[in-house]
């Protein structure tokens, strides 16, 4: 009987059912990932469930695309799941580079919060699909919005990795040899003989996480830059102006400046250790305000609607 109802709902409401399945699998994955941290050993089960979650979100978004007839990123519900998809994908890519139990343990709670917000907090009218206004019926929708959302995912992952570096080293000095290129990134090389530089240097746990954080933020910054440029071109085509300084645009520019400053301090000034980790961790709040905070204003071309109205 329960299975009959499940499959019946899956046929008639596939987007909602798949969204709930994502929530329950993340809920199962959370204690497993935390247990792996205490055991200090990466869990294959956590990675397997994360892959399943990513595939379920992919299927959910494809169903929504088929039902609505447009790329599924036009309202807050869709964009939240797209963001969760990006973070789960980023988590898997990071774990492919460096397997550490702390990586899923910091990513999965954020994924669960995002999906919970989409499932249980958003009102029904913000979950349902609707026809796009003429200005949004453009191929720029896919290019601009998807790239910006992927930049948010990469920046969030970078911030979470920096938080993990700070957490691991909360009661001890933080000395990190960085992979950041540039003037500051190569200061360490002066203290090593030439022969030693030929051999690979084994990085510590914190250094590996810091390197992954830096790379994630660099990727996110590049994507955010492309998103801002594509958005400006689209705005000029649709409304005849490159930039209107609405709340979302303003905060996106603030986010861009914030991460530009972070990368500048790491690459050119040689920032290492606790300072860049603190700055990158603060970036999580910057992205949160940029993505969700402006919706509470309920104004602007980019607002997904007044959440509690």
From Swiss-Prot:
Pfam family, any one: Cytochrom_C_asm
Originating species: Prochlorococcus marinus (strain MIT 9301)
InterPro entries reported in the protein's UniProt record: Cyt_c_assembly, Cyt_c_biogenesis_CcsA, Cyt_c_biogenesis_CcsA/CcmC
Name of the molecule in the record: Cytochrome c biogenesis protein CcsA
Gene Ontology molecular function: heme binding
Keyword Hydrolase (UniProt): no
Subunit description: May interact with ccs1.
Main location: membrane
GN (gene name): ccsA
Residue ranges that the Swiss-Prot or TrEMBL entry lists as coiled coil: none
